[in-house]
Amino acid sequence: GPWLLAVAVFLGSFVLFTRHNDFPYSYHPDESGKCGQVIKGIRNYHHPLLLLSLTDVASRVGFVARTPQAIVETGRGVAAALAAGAAAALALLAWRCAGLLAGWCAGAAVALQADLFETAHYLKEDPALVFGLALSLLAAHLWWRAPGRKTLRFLGIACGLAAVGKYVGIIVLIFAVPLVVWHRASDAALTRNVRLRLFAFAFAFTFLAGNLPLFATKLTSPFRSVSNEMKGVAGGHRGITREVPHREYLDMLRKDLPPAVGLLAGAYVLALLGTARRRTPPEWVTVLLPLGYLAMISCSPKIASRYLLPVSTLLPLLATLGAAEIAGVVRAADSRWRRAAGAAVLAGLAGWIVWTELPPLRTALAGFTRDDPAEVAAWITANLPPDSVIAEDHRVNLSPDKADGAAKFARVPQKVLDANFAPDLGSVDELLAKGVTHVAVCRASYSRYFNDETGAQGSGKTGYDKRRDFYQRVFRDGELLREWPRGTITYLQPGIRLYRIAPAKAPAPAP
């Protein structure tokens, strides 16, 4: 039944999403700050507090050591659980729409989606957002089919979880409120005003409860934090902006979307258009939500592949529903053989979806086993003179902690100067004067300064030009000693280059 479906999809997804999630916390630029909030009892409200609160509770219940690595790994487990919850919710949604077999197929298709698998490995809020969106879609279908107080409260709670996952999750209100207003409940006492009050109370209670600063002793202004985040989304990030709308996310989908997923999701859209009169509003919402979300993020100059996660996660669901529509053409309720043929068609098309999803999933899984920063540190230890001085982009990770100067706990015996961006340590000439002999740069850091579609934002032009000029000179005048190319998992394979900028020492004369 559906409970077995939900439990099996959740457990299977959770086991998959927690594989190889023990890499160093310093590899992800955001995880150190988040674990610091948990350990120090600080909350900055850059994002809603659901993920951090669950991480804090899980670490205390599990008697986890209050160290950065232990807390981050606990938080990654929480993120994996939320992602697994999203897969289970979408499996139940497919069951409600197209039957139990479709539910199993959708659960497998969503769980094996490579972007969801990767993002579930980080202490980041994106899985919490996807969980809330998936639960909201399920709740919308349940409310429409059985309008009552329980399903209405569930819809309010689910929408609250979407908003408390990430602030952008509040977009669920765009479809949830009209569904509450337009759809009459079976209970005559549930008038429009009563429905709105019940929904609003459930939503507000969930949002406020999820943002309670549990175990926190120091808070920053939530209004200032939210304002800063919104400015970054609307205006750009780290002094860099671009023209909007842009096609970055469409290009990502075109490049990464498995063909079976795209074709069968398109088939579902065509099926809805061809039978529009007998379709329910929640069915249309299931299609329009990812399309609307894609349009929204394409109007923000702040770009990251993880922002596409809600779209990437919902597309396998739509593809499975498309497969179910095709199977429905074959199947006839009064014929056992036709029903069996329809089930075979659905299973076969779902197998096609899974088969096209497996190559990127295998690549992502293998990516979490390749640790380039550790290889770089080992190579430097073995091949550079002990008196070398290395300036690095922090993403190279010779220094686990951001030092903004000389690193105290370098992973190599050589002296390391560390900053978020190596140019912030000084110009090439200034670094040479300080005795710097080598520069280690990271594509994940410098590539933004060589993208024709990006540019400096207002007062950030001076810093933008300084960083670009620094990298250009290193690439032009430095001697490339070794390169570790960028890989699938950019936090473990960020694309590292090691240059010598000081003249090579002449060999000592023979005695």
Where are these regions (language model features)?
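Transmembrane alpha-helical segments
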Residues: 15-16, 322, 342-370, 408
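Transmembrane signal-anchor helices characteristic of membrane glycosylation enzymes that use polyprenol
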Residues: 2-27, 108-112, 201-217, 295, ...
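Transmembrane-lumen/periplasm boundary regions of multi-pass, lipid-linked membrane glycan transferases
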Residues: 34, 41-47, 53, 60, ...
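Short periplasmic/luminal acceptor-recognition loop of GT-C membrane glycosyltransferases, typified by
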Residues: 381-416, 432, 436-447, 491
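Membrane-interface transmembrane helices that cradle and orient dolichyl/undecaprenyl
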Residues: 96-97, 136-154, 162, 184-186, ...
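Transmembrane-helix motifs of polytopic, lipid-linked glycan transferases
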Residues: 65, 73, 77-97, 135, ...
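Short acidic/glycine- and proline-prone juxtamembrane loop motifs at membrane-interface regions
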Residues: 115, 121-128, 304
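Aromatic/acidic, Gly/Pro-rich catalytic loop(s) in extracytoplasmic/lumenal soluble domains
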Residues: 426-429, 434-511
